[in-house]
């Protein structure tokens, strides 16, 4: 018999209990009863083994053992969450029937939304959602989804490049912000030029002398929104627009002349930086903005009307330019990079000592960003790659509408003591108090227009008045009592009107028509329909946005039309033929706009606001045409109809076009609808110029094709900023960029709203929808400011509060004052 112990089955009782490795989700482990955090460095030797000398040391504080997080559902814009938000299951089952393999979206671990942050969440959600929608298309869903998926990954690669540059390259994040700011300053939000011709002002695209910034022998640097018209001999011709701010004689940049100026610019900036007097040089440079650098070389006129009638542009051409916009831009960048070796040889051969000294100094101090900027600046002056591009407008047009003439009442004009009014016996003032569309005024056949020619005999055209000039003031009095039917008769100031003396409703114009109710003199509403002696209409108010309306119109109990309104504008001039303007009098004074001078329903001398009782108050406007109008007054949107006096065959030259302050509606992808024989101040998106239709008088183009429009613009503000940055003028650079931000505030408004929408979207769909609804109805800084304050984005809130209300033009006096302040401060220190 063996003396060895009998083998036993291993159980929990007889098994040697040795410490087992316990794995936690975070990667840590327990050693000696202490939870140790996971090591981030290289794992060498025996892990978590205490030395003999350390065993006598007191143990550290025990770390709590982490618990595995419970899996949560994916939210909107997160990887793995199907898009769109609604109808995904229905689209999936419907798409599975004709295309079973390409219906369900499946991204896997390569979902671009996994690396998204900030604005990238919005971009990747849109691109990936577009990919998912492509998969729902029957039969061809799979190949289309594959192509769209490749495009989404390409967009993600570009975003990764931007993220790497902003997070790793020193100073690149600020440079991207600077480029975004300069892109906002390229084409202004509203730019148009005015020419004075034979006593009338009219719109043009020709640059005035005040828009010319710098002149070379074969090139002109000018402000955006115009094209130079140069007189050579006995004829004037338009120069070729290379960029929105540079025009040349023959479409080629004169490299020799520009390189001389770049040589001087870089050399002086390098000297200031090397001597550590950058702010001193920058302040002197800013003060020098008050003086002219070079004499005039060319005779610029305004007799060409460059690109005012570009011809018909289809939506296909616009879409083609948009698709082709990236390829020439890439070619332009690559061409400039490949041109650097030749540029270095040209520097040495051409003895450009300023550029060479700048490159040498910036290389020695290790400022490679400035070296690259100087190289690209010198190599880019002979680039001949041009880009034609555009952007689509985001607007909608509602073509359906009902003209509502109202109920039938026989109306006839009567002349009493030289004043025309409606026959009192034909009207029923009690029935007319119903202001709905069912009980309006009368049908066309119920009006006898035999007296209209005599009634309108006292009305005059805008061309019959003298031209105004100088600053605009306001008149104190008003026009006659019984002749408000002509556009040029200024109304009296509004006050309190007894309700018993009014027949029908009282309409006031904001410019949208609104009906004013009866109240007592203290403002408390009454409901006796004006039967009491104490019922009145309180109409005294001021012009929007400070007040409620521009003016009011009603009919008194004897059939006469009465009006009141804000004080009209006095546009200047001498003699007895001057005009007190109650509407937009652009052709007599460019500063007389409707928002500044409007005193009633007249939007222009041809058009007035259409409302249900228009044919009662203005019966001779029965043949006016109706146009859809959208306006913004004080940041508030107004959608209304305008009745315009326009007949086919009338002359509509540039001298005959009025100005209309509209945010026009779209007729097509490339056309806006404006009032007949007028123009709106919004320039075309691609060129920054005014483009009108030559044959159709109520069409203006939102997209235009210039001679050769480059995507990169050169402005004098950029030249000043480049000099200040190269010269290390830190204080002057900050002041100059503050001026640029204030100048670009109008273009930054939409950018601020987009940024606030992105911030709200990162906190969920509900917050995004709430922000969208408020931003749709409330314009201004309140909604983005509330979002920034709610989510704690205090730097953006401070930036938003620092922006001015309106974008003011950057003039030389402001720049010189900033430079003078810095110069005095340096001398005092």
Curated annotation (Swiss-Prot):
Region called PKR/eIF2-alpha phosphorylation homology domain (PePHD), residue ranges: 660-671
Gene Ontology BP annotations: clathrin-dependent endocytosis of virus by host cell; fusion of virus membrane with host endosome membrane; monoatomic ion transmembrane transport; proteolysis; symbiont-mediated suppression of host innate immune response; virion attachment to host cell
Residue numbers spanned by region HVR1: 385-411
Segments of this protein annotated with the region Important for endoplasmic reticulum and mitochondrial localization: 112-152
Segments on the Cytoplasmic face: 2-168, 779-781
Enzyme class at the top of the EC tree: hydrolase
One MF annotation (Gene Ontology) recorded for this entry: channel activity
InterPro entries assigned: HCV_Core_C (IPR002521), HCV_core_chain_A (IPR044896), HCV_core_N (IPR002522), HCV_Env (IPR002519), HCV_NS1 (IPR002531), HCV_p7 (IPR049913)
Positions of region (Disordered): 2-75
Carbohydrate-modified residues: 196, 209, 234, 305, 417, 423, 430, 448, 540, 556, 576, 623, 645
Note: Viral particle assembly takes place at the surface of ER-derived membranes in close proximity to lipid droplets. NS2 associates with E1/E2 glycoproteins, NS3 and NS5A, which interacts with the viral RNA and core protein to promote genome encapsidation. The nucleocapsid buds at the ER membrane where E1/E2 glycoproteins are anchored and afterward associate with nascent lipid droplet to acquire APOE and APOC. Secretion of viral particles is probably regulated by viroporin p7.
Record-stated family: Belongs to the hepacivirus polyprotein family.
Protein's name in the database: Genome polyprotein
Organism field: Hepatitis C virus (isolate Glasgow)
Upper lineage: Viruses, Riboviria, Orthornavirae, Kitrinoviricota, Flasuviricetes
